[in-house]
From Swiss-Prot:
An aminoacyl-tRNA editing enzyme that deacylates mischarged D-aminoacyl-tRNAs. Also deacylates mischarged glycyl-tRNA(Ala), protecting cells against glycine mischarging by AlaRS. Acts via tRNA-based rather than protein-based catalysis; rejects L-amino acids rather than detecting D-amino acids in the active site. By recycling D-aminoacyl-tRNA to D-amino acids and free tRNA molecules, this enzyme counteracts the toxicity associated with the formation of D-aminoacyl-tRNA entities in vivo and helps enforce protein L-homochirality. The lineage of its organism: Bacteria, Bacillati, Bacillota, Clostridia, Moorellales. InterPro entries: Daa-tRNA_deacyls_DTD, DTD-like_sf. The gene is dtd. It comes from Moorella thermoacetica (strain ATCC 39073 / JCM 9320). Homodimer. This is D-aminoacyl-tRNA deacylase.
Length: 149
């Protein structure tokens, strides 16, 4: 399971001209689910993201988590995080989980964040979304449940 985590001042998701989710200060998380992923991957990333200290404390040091700041999380499913561009010019997405498996694990991930006391908004699974964000910093982290990076 892979995540691109961005510290934001605000973010929103629009589908077919309708705003379906919006958050204030917090994290925008793009989540990719791989074929081999399961509940342990969900728990690892939810725990890592909930506790990731990428917000400034009173001394200006990155020392606070989204939970510490009372920030929100916008979780957006993104299978393209499993795009393999090593061969040719067209990405291969064969490592991405099939939709049914990905939806199940995405829902588990959202629930795991909420269980850790976070307010979580979501994109719409398999929808063509417009995601707008105001990146804070910018601060962007790449996470992988297999600890590849």
């Amino acid at each position: 399971m892979r995540a691109v985590v961005q510290r934001v001042k605000k973010a929103r998701v629009t589908v077919a001209g309708e705003e379906i989710a919006t958050i204030g200060p917090g994290l925008l998380v793009f989540l990719g689910v791989g074929q081999q992923d399961g509940p342990a991957d969900v728990e690892y990333l939810a725990d890592k993201i909930a506790g990731l200290r990428i917000f400034a404390d009173e001394d200006g040091k990155m020392n606070l988590s989204v939970r510490d700041t009372g920030g929100e999380v916008l979780a957006v499913s993104q299978f393209t995080l499993y795009g393999d561009c090593r061969k040719g010019r067209r990405p291969s997405f064969t490592a991405a989980a099939p939709p049914e498996q990905a939806l199940n694990l995405y829902r588990q991930f959202v629930a795991a964040l909420a269980a850790r006391g976070l307010k979580v908004a979501t994109g719409r699974f398999q929808a063509d979304m417009l995601v707008a964000l105001e990146n804070d910093g910018p601060v962007t982290m790449l996470l992988d449940s297999q600890r590849l990076f």
